Amino acid sequence: MAEVKKPFHEQVAERLIEQLKAGTAPWQKPWEPGMPGSFIPLNPTTGKRYKGINAIQLMAQGHADPRWMTYKQAAAAGAQVRRGEKGTPIQYWKFSEEQTKTDEQTGKPVLDANGDPVKVTVQLERPRVFFATVFNAEQIDGLPPLERKEQTWSAVERAEHILAASGATIRHGEHDRAFYRPSTDSIHLPDKGQFPSADNYYATALHELGHWTGHPSRLDRDLAHPFGSEGYAKEELRAEIASMILGDELGIGHDPGQHAAYVGSWIKALQEDPLEIFRAAADAEKIQDFVLAFEQKQIQEQTTQQAIEPAQGATMEQQQDQVARPAIAPADELIAQTLRMYRAGAEPAEGNQSLAALTETTLGFELPADWTGRVQVQANVEVEHDGERSVVPAGDREPEFWGVYANHAWGGHQWLADFAGPDAQTNAEALADRLAVIDAYATANEYEQAAKFARIHEERVRRDPNSTDEDRVAAKEARKAAEGTAMLHDEDLQRRIADYEREQQEMAQAMNAAEQPAAAQAPAKPERAYLNVPFKEKDEVKALGARWDRQERAWYVPAGVDPAPFAKWAREGATAAVEARAEAQPTQPTAERPNAAQERVYLAVPYGERQVAKAAGAQWDKVAKSWYAGPNADMGKLQRWLPDNVPTQQSPAVTPEDEFAEALKSMGCVVTPGGEHPIMDGKKHRIETEGDKKGEKSGFYVGHLDGHPAGYIKNNRTGVEMKWKAKGYALDPAEKAKMQAEAAAKLAARAEEQERQHEATAQRIGRQAQSLVPITEPTPYLRDKGLQVHAGVLTDQEGQKTYIPAYDADGKQWTMQYIQEDGTKRFAKDSRKEGCFHVVGGMDALAAAPALVIGEGYATAATVAEALGHATVAAFDSGNLQAVAEALHAKFPDKPVVIAGDDDRQVQITQGVNPGRTKAQEAAKAVGGKAIFPIFAPGENAYPKELPPITPENYRNHLHAEKRLADAAAGKVQLSEADTAKLKESLLNDGQLAALSNMKKHTDFNDLSERSSLGKDGVERQVRSAVGKVLLDEGQRQKVQQLKQQDIEQQEQRQRRARTY
């Protein structure tokens, strides 16, 4: 199975976690003073250094040379990236883009004096993230040696000037340690004489100055955390990275030794939230910029970030009134109280039950002590492979039962319970709901608890078939209000429910903009001819002069533009409907709040101006991907962002469905216009991929629209996977081409690596075969199967194990089947089995055989060969039958093909499928052959009618009950008498089990020979008759073909004679 490619931030965080543990993270390495510009990565082409997380990511690669560049930049410099070198990914954000300026009246491009289109810069409301791959100078041949920058300044003087210009209060000698005290806004340092050098003193002073920048009057970071806390460690991480950057810039070095105590907290923070390092690196850059600004002759006044007032939402008490606390049974409440103690780190009081014992008694299973509160409900099926049964997700199969699982804090899952029967899903969801209530009551924080109650209520309303749309909307709004209040009061919950917009906001600095004079009234919207424009055709209508109406979320033909070219997109009755609605609404002053959500006034707010607009009352619409005037908006201040006042705007956001469809296409999935895909319902779906045969669906995806739309895609043909999250824009052609190229490269690399492994294994098997000997006396396996000794099969020196070589159609040996004395079978590791087989009698004998007779295993093939008196083929398993049949049919196209299949009737009863029969029939159909199956004596391979029937469901219940009773007998679980009695009722009786066991012993032609009352004579009669009929049919077919060919030749001769006359 292909490894899932992790998001960029998780890859970066995981590498840094490993380096933190080893003490080798970039900011953990000490640097000597006097070497400026030697450590922070830079791009020699642009002359600029990499910043933020990109600098951390590149430094973490461990190269001594700080120079990094793209492949193209290296080539442009006359250098060449060495073959086989692996690049390092970085990311950057695009906050503006160029657009062609169009005439507002005609919609045509505006040209300059040279006839070229005039370009205008548009600030993006939804910044876009891009990725690039860079290589270190040590990976590139042909670059000149690194020239170290000579330090032409006094690092001490620069540092002293910065400290003096900052105006910070610095006190010496009061303490033996260095620290910044937020309450007095002062830096405290030991006496200068206590430092080993001046560089060390100034490096320490600048580190504390980094903390000083976090004061509310400066960069306003959260400094209200006690020494040793997680919040304190996060602030230290920011100051430490900033010190590293400043140390490289000034040349005063960097000494991280005194901050080793924070390593554990840093690791924990990155494990819980990989994005923390991104935020820390961004804040470190702000610290560095703020500090270095004091070097300039004219110190610019630093503006403080505007405080964001809490939204006017429901109070805590109002929320609890809106969403009633769900009822909880006394026993469940006791579990919640115990769980709360565990989460707080306390042990249960003496005499009280442990959490495991309490949950086992009350719920029937143990809840893990590190349970996160999350529960997963999953549809499952049981499958059997190589004699072993296992539970797997149902996927697109009919679920056999539903499982409930609890999430561990470390990310794993623990099975809790299974449910079968017609109400299985309902019962599983009811248990999940019960556990959600327990988790909510176990939550100590009242705001987070209220949010959990609201989620439970929303889920119950969603599942209730009697709920109306109004009920669902009200429940959703109550949940959002509760989560919003919790977010404002709880830092940890804020981190966990932060979505992609916050992720973007943390990575970019806000830009302040001057406010425009207030307007008395918003201009009335002119009459507009609205259009029905598919997303893919938006560029076409835009080029013709159409504009986007954010409030109606539709394209329209502006006044003065000829409507004729837009005829195919005309929306009948749409314009009239909009006008009628507008006339029916009373005119209101612009400063008043809109009446309802559907009457929102949308705005065109560039990303850099979002904080100013937010302070004026703008709010973000996640669905429309646009800002709008909130309920308490000051329309006078928002006037400047009304769409009509912003001539150049970013194109409307692509809908999640269209964006997900584009992602599917980029992954090689087939999405047809007007087709059913994608289905964004949160369920699993199969989809056709490029290169699939008719009926195949090698693609798989899950997509949902709840909250922040997201999904997962996998192309099983290429092995490439994608975790998708809506961004509001589609991939451009270059990005699509890059993704497709990466998929093709991965597919080729996988195929190349697999071929290499197969070849190496084939050579290893060849060497191993030299120590084996041909079989002269039957091995234990051959004796057990009643088989004669046939040439080509090998054994060890003791004659105990059986070795069966497997070849391809060209005669090359790729693998070997090893059979132990007890019949256990396995193949060589990393070997090729598909399309490989063993010929009983050898390839020369097969060439002389009248037909290609192919069986699943060696025992079947050898039994049939002894009955027919000519060579047969063993394909080793049912899944390999078709590949072997196609390979041999291509080599011997004139020979008829007979598939001697297994009849797995006991599997049909217990699992609902008969893999032996199905695979044999598919193989025969693929080559125009015939599938034959053994016919046993009455009662040998049939389930007795007098016994109670067995279905896949009650067989699964039997296995579950058998396991639970075995666990109870071993002391692993405790069962009540009622539970024990109920489980025993689910067990199959002895007669049923004996019948299944007997059927399992009668499936193939070797069983017919050795275990059936019909014996070898039965095999001979059946296979000779079946193969003889196939040969007879083939002979007749060939005779008919010959006659047809003779007729054709005679007609051609008559035509030639006629032309002669």
UniProtKB/Swiss-Prot annotation:
Gene Ontology BP annotations: DNA replication
SMART domains to which the protein is assigned, alphabetical: TOPRIM
UniProtKB keywords: DNA replication, DNA-directed RNA polymerase, Nucleotidyltransferase, Plasmid, Transcription, Transferase
Domain of life: Bacteria
Main EC class the enzyme belongs to: transferase
UniProt cross-references to PROSITE patterns, sorted A to Z: TOPRIM (PS50880)
Region (Disordered): 1034-1061
GO cellular component: DNA-directed RNA polymerase complex
Domain Toprim: 850-938
GO molecular function list: nucleotidyltransferase activity; single-stranded DNA binding
EC number(s) stated in the UniProt entry for this protein: 2.7.7.-
Task performed by this protein: Required for autonomous replication in E.coli. Transferred into the recipient cell during bacterial conjugation. Catalyzes the synthesis of short oligoribonucleotide primers with CpA or pCpA at their 5'-termini on a single-stranded template DNA.
UniProt name for this protein: DNA primase TraC
Organism: Escherichia coli
